[in-house]
């Protein structure tokens, strides 16, 4: 076999690489500026943190502090999302991840990122990891685009050495939905699935020129057929939306330009389609028509959730709000939006497409308003003439709402005839990698074996007016992990925590553990309750979670599966005797690894300079 001569491809194809030259002084100047740019921020942060006397986290030192408590927390959070992780002690990978997360949380990062994003969006018309900037001022949620272009729900992604071995465990949509359908069927309940087409499916012309609507994933139709084959009453809205789109006047649209969601008019039309499907059921005539309503047309403004993903501070200064004429649905008896009714034969499960125009925190709300009452749930209840049992969670349409329904009580579930499950179609179409990036998790749910009291007259109450029905002291046993609030499509979130009961001060409670939901973050900022750690003893003033209107529909980070009554904490706080006293923590403790590292760097520099000096002295003079 003859030897092949290696050839330069540039010479072979007649291409000639460009030669760039620069003076020594220029190179030194640019090198120094570059080094200063990348070293000044971390140096300032390390110096600033090193000067603290009450609490201290110095990155350059903590990098060598392995293992530590934060590494344990990082491993615990990973294990909750993947049963494949068997190790009991944190590895170096856990440590590096924990350090990286703490560095990202640096205070100066926020202002730098904010200014950079402002320049990137205004000058280069680019978004970020969550937002894609389209044409004519339209913004698109990136996971919605990923749901149309990835492997999809039917073909598993190939494994790869480039994937994080500790990534959240992915469960395919079909087996999870099939099991949930079977669980409902065993209880005599029918499932109606309403996948809501996301904005790029219906308005792709604003994403890029030349794309025709409707835009579908290649496996979407096959997926829907498989779901129908399970006995699911699947409502495909695509054709209806395209018909309505054809009748639009110039300047009108079915979705909001700067928001993920549909317009109020589109929502009302979809509610009418779903209501007609429900009314066609043979048992609908026997449903108690127990809801009389009055309506109120108002105009509301909202800048859009995707604008909030691009800029956290004062989005209204640089972006124009969109105006919507909405119709509030109010219970004639109470003057408030229709309350969720545990005794209803119809349950509605949904994500933010159900919450928009109802939950003030995700748009179109007024200061001090706890519920708008113009969303999908209120509109559907009006059309059906009956109260619904409603479970919603922003970003939690795949698992959280099913889990909440399954845990609502054995007698509550068995009373149902129909579950209407409204979910963004992207969650049905995402494959593993984009699904994990979007925080979408598909999990099986366990149905509660407890019976609960069902109120005769459903009435929602506001948390500020509620008096605690149970006051106890609990020791935190386990808690759910929270996503980065800067990377989520929702601005607020609760999280679940499991407490061992130490003492009951008020009320009766027979269980040894309590499942409590606390605030995780508000306005995309972590709050004091987020800092509770396993082992903390906490005094809790509790009310049943379903009674609290102010948290209805808000995302709930919940990766605990305990068949217990769910409470909301009105006033959580560490017991006085367990609060750590403020004290000076003493001088810095320098890890040995850091000392050896510095010695090695200094030795390397000295040896390098010595070699260079000797070579210059030995070089012959021309």
PLM regions and their residue ranges:
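Extracellular glycan-modifying ectodomains
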Residues: 2-473, 488, 492, 502, ...
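Selective detector of the "anchor" transmembrane alpha-helix that sits immediately C-terminal
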Residues: 589-612
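Short, aromatic-rich amphipathic segments at membrane interfaces
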Residues: 576-593
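Short, mixed charged/polar active-site loops
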Residues: 469-471, 509-514, 602, 606
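Disulfide-stabilized netrin-like
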Residues: 493-577
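Short, charged juxtamembrane terminal tails flanking transmembrane helices
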Residues: 616-622
């Amino acid at each position: 076999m003859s030897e092949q001569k290696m050839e330069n491809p540039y010479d072979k194809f007649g291409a000639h690489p460009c030669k760039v030259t620069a003076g020594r002084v220029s190179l030194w100047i640019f090198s120094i500026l570059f080094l200063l740019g990348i070293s000044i921020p971390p140096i300032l942060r390390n110096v600033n943190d090193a000067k603290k006397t009450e609490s201290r986290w110095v990155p350059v030192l903590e990098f060598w502090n392995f293992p530590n408590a934060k590494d344990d927390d990082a491993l615990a959070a990973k294990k909750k999302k993947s049963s494949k992780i068997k190790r009991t002690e944190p590895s170096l990978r856990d440590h590096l991840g924990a350090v990286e997360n703490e560095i990202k949380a640096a205070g100066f990062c926020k202002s730098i990122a904010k200014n950079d994003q402002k320049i990137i969006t205004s000058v280069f018309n680019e978004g970020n990891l969550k937002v894609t900037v389209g044409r004519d001022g339209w913004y698109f949620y990136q996971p919605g685009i990923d749901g149309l272009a990835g492997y999809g729900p039917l073909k598993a992604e190939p494994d790869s050495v480039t994937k994080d071995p500790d990534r959240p465990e992915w469960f395919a949509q079909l087996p999870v939905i099939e099991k949930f359908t079977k669980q409902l069927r065993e209880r005599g309940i029918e499932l109606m699935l309403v996948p809501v087409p996301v904005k790029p499916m219906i308005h792709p012309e604003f994403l890029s020129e030349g794309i025709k609507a409707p835009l579908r994933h290649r496996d979407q139709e096959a997926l829907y057929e498989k779901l129908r084959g399970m006995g699911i009453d699947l409502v495909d809205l695509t054709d209806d939306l395209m018909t309505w789109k054809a009748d639009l006047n110039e300047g009108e649209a079915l979705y909001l330009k700067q928001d993920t969601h549909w317009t109020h008019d589109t929502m009302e039309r979809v509610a009418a389609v779903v209501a007609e499907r429900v009314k066609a059921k043979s048992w609908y005539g026997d449903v108690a028509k127990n809801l009389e309503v009055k309506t109120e047309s108002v105009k509301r403004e909202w800048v859009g959730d995707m604008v909030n993903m691009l800029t956290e501070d004062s989005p209204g200064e640089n972006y124009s709000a969109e105006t919507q004429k909405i119709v509030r649905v109010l219970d004639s008896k109470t003057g408030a939006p229709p309350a969720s009714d545990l005794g209803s034969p119809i349950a509605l499960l949904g994500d933010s497409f159900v919450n928009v125009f109802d939950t003030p925190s995700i748009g179109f709300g007024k200061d001090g308003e706890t519920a708008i009452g113009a969303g999908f749930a209120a509109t559907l209840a009006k059309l059906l003439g009956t109260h619904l049992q409603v479970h919603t969670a922003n970003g939690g349409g795949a698992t959280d709402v099913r889990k909440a329904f399954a845990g609502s009580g054995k007698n509550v579930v068995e009373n149902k005839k129909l579950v209407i499950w409204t979910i963004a179609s992207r969650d049905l179409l995402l494959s593993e990698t984009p699904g994990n990036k979007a925080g979408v998790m598909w999990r099986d749910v366990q149905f509660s074996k407890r019976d609960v009291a069902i109120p005769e007259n459903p009435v929602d109450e506001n948390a500020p007016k509620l008096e605690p029905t149970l006051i106890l002291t609990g020791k935190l046993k386990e808690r759910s992990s929270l996503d980065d609030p800067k990377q989520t499509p929702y601005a607020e979130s609760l999280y679940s925590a499991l407490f061992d009961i130490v003492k009951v001060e008020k009320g009766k409670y027979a269980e040894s553990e309590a499942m409590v939901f606390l605030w995780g973050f508000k306005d995309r900022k972590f709050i004091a309750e987020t800092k509770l750690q396993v082992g903390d003893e906490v005094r809790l003033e509790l009310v049943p979670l379903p009674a609290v209107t102010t948290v209805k529909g808000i995302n709930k980070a919940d990766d605990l599966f305990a068949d217990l009554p769910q409470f909301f904490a009105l006033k959580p706080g560490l017991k006085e005797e367990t609060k750590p006293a403020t004290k000076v923590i003493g001088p810095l403790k320098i890890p040995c690894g850091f000392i050896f590292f510095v010695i090695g760097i200094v030795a390397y520099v000295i040896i390098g300079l010595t070699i260079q000096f000797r070579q210059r002295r030995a070089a012959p003079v021309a």
